[in-house]
Amino acid sequence: MLKSFEHVGMTVSDMDRAIEFYCTLLGLRLHLRKTASDGSHIAFLDAGGAMLEVFAPADGAARAVDVPEGASGLRHLTFLFEDIDATFAKLEEAGVELKERPRLAINREILHKVAFVRDPDGILIELAERAD
């Protein structure tokens, strides 16, 4: 029987930069960080109910590309916030690449507002807020 969603894994080019973005700017918590014998790095970041598993190859990684129209794949990662206007302003102040400013969500049955930014490697991040 399913218990919950556990984690999603992703590759980044620079572990320190990824931890700065996800932990310092978005508020995830560093749960574990290790260096493998080949020099690559792995970290688990607690997102408050599920984890983000982050891999950083020793030789770095190329910038992420969006899933092409008509192709299968993960489109974005979504994190839930109490106030996405404040979060978006914080990210803008920090110089994060902005994709779409806060707006009312299309799927209002689930989310109230959404916004989109890119992490340091170009991965699309959705900021979401519910109207509880």
Language-model region placement:
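Helix N-cap motif at beta-to-alpha junctions
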Residues: D14-M15, E82-I84
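Conserved beta-strand-loop-alpha-helix junction that forms the acyl-donor binding cleft
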Residues: V12-M15, A36-D38
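Conserved active-site tyrosine of GNAT-family acetyltransferases
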Residues: A18-C23, L91, G122
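Short glycine-/small-residue motifs
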Residues: E126-L127
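Vicinal oxygen chelate
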Residues: M1-S4, R29-T78, A89-R118, R130-D132
